[in-house]
């Protein structure tokens, strides 16, 4: 009996231990994988993990990484609001200048630009890959700590003489490369559509068919979509050109310098007169540099504005050619329709004349005795008289229609 109790207690202790062993793992939450670990997941897993998307981060030192990040991570790195970040995920082109970042959406290129780095959405898109290659070319990798420090100070420290005068700020150069890639994309599409347009228009002038008309309609739809893209980006650039203050908001490096100067002034132990004199000298020197950079930015925007304006005019010219061809095709169709109507009227007039002759023949075919039946050789004269009557009726009707200008 005692051995039975001991074995039962041993089994209960083993069972309790097993229950504890089974419960311990359930109390531990699974570790959250890093952003880079989610890159290879499926679309459903990305949605379950809070909208993780593939982003490419490229900084001013030439360092580049590709990782899957959610919106909260991008907001934390770029200091933009969630409302502004939604602009990058929309299908409409938009350029937003904020305190610490620029949200750029050119449809094919979607990026968040800061004074230190640029984050590109849709890393596997061909246009984004082209932009990444251009960035690698313009910002070669600097692996050494001295080079990294020099590159950072070169863009952010004022220096009065060799600071910002030596080259454009990082964000300006990224904008320039992005506009260059976008203009190249639009230009290639315009060339392709122009080639298709001329071939389709030549075919239409030779032969009007349903297949050619379908191709023309598809081409016109593509031109309309491309024109809307170009027009939207052009309007965004024009907005910054018209508003100097908004253009100055694109200068993120200047804001960073001003913040650094403010912090240095608040933490300085220099006497107040010397500090004011030193600050005024730095401000006067930086104002000249900033004005030069703003002028450079204005010239940059004007250059791409004119380039987009030229592409827009080329697209509008192609649409005018298409509209002219459509008008020509409509004229041909109307001419053919008028010819068919003319032929139908002539046939109807002929039917009217023949019907009149048939009435005469039917009258003679009735079983009513008349004197003509006994007249010899009268049949031929009657037949030719009926034919002459039909011809006369046809000529008279056609002449009346032409007199009333119903027929040409």
Curated annotation (Swiss-Prot):
Residues 1-44 are annotated as: Disordered. CDD domains: Mrs2_Mfm1p-like. A motif (Required for magnesium transport activity) lies at residues 365-367. One of its GO terms (cellular component) is plasma membrane. GO terms for biological process: pollen development. The chain crosses the membrane at residues 345-365, 378-398. Residues 1-96 form a transit peptide. Pfam families: MRS2-like. Residues 1-10 have a biased composition (Polar residues). The keyword Calcium does not apply. It is found in: Mitochondrion membrane. GO terms for molecular function: magnesium ion transmembrane transporter activity. It is a multi-pass membrane protein. Expressed predominantly in flowers notably in anthers at early stages of flower development. InterPro entries: MRS2-like. Keywords: Ion transport, Magnesium, Membrane, Mitochondrion, Transit peptide, Transmembrane, Transmembrane helix, Transport. Magnesium transporter that mediates the influx/efflux of magnesium in a concentration-dependent manner. Plays a crucial role in male gametophyte development and male fertility. Has the ability to complement mutants in Salmonella typhimurium and yeast lacking magnesium transport capability. Belongs to the CorA metal ion transporter (MIT) (TC 1.A.35.5) family. This is Magnesium transporter MRS2-6, mitochondrial. The lineage of its organism: Eukaryota, Viridiplantae, Streptophyta, Embryophyta, Tracheophyta. The gene is MRS2-6.
């Amino acid at each position: 009996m005692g051995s039975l109790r001991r074995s039962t207690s041993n089994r209960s202790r083993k069972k309790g231990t097993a229950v504890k062993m089974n419960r311990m793992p359930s109390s531990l939450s699974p570790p959250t994988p890093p952003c880079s670990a989610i890159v290879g997941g499926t679309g459903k897993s990305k949605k379950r993990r809070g909208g993780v998307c593939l982003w490419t981060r490229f900084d001013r030192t030439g360092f580049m990484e590709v990782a899957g990040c959610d919106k909260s991570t991008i907001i934390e790195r770029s200091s933009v609001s969630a409302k502004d970040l939604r602009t990058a995920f929309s299908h409409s082109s938009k350029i937003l200048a904020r305190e610490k970042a620029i949200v750029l959406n050119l449809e094919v290129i979607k990026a968040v630009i800061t004074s230190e780095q640029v984050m590109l959405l849709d890393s596997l898109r061909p246009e984004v890959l082209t932009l990444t290659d251009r960035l690698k070319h313009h910002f070669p990798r600097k692996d050494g700590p001295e080079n990294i420090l020099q590159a950072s100070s070169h863009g952010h420290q004022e220096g009065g003489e060799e600071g910002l005068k030596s080259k454009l700020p990082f964000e300006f150069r990224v904008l320039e490369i992005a506009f260059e890639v976008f203009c190249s994309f639009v230009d290639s599409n315009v060339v392709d559509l122009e080639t298709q347009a001329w071939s389709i228009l030549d075919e239409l002038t030779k032969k009007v068919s349903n297949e050619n008309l379908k191709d023309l309609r598809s081409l016109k739809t593509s031109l309309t979509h491309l024109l809307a893209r170009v027009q939207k980006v052009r309007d965004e650039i024009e907005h910054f050109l018209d508003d100097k203050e908004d253009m100055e908001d694109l200068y993120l490096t200047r804001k960073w310098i001003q913040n650094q100067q403010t912090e240095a002034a608040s933490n300085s132990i220099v006497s107040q007169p010397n500090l004011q004199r030193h600050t005024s000298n730095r401000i006067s020197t930086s104002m000249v540099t900033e004005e030069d950079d703003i002028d450079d930015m204005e010239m940059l925007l004007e250059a791409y504005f004119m380039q987009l304006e030229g592409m827009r005019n080329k697209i509008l010219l192609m649409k005018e050619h298409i509209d002219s061809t459509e008008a020509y095709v409509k004229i041909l169709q109307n001419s053919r329709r008028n010819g068919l109507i003319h032929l139908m009227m002539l046939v109807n007039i002929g039917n009217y004349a023949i019907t009149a002759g048939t009435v005469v023949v039917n009258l003679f075919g009735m079983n009513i005795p008349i004197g003509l039946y006994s007249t010899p050789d009268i049949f031929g004269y009657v037949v030719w008289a009926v034919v002459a009557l039909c011809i006369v009726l046809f000529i008279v009707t056609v002449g009346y229609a032409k007199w009333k200008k119903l027929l040409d």
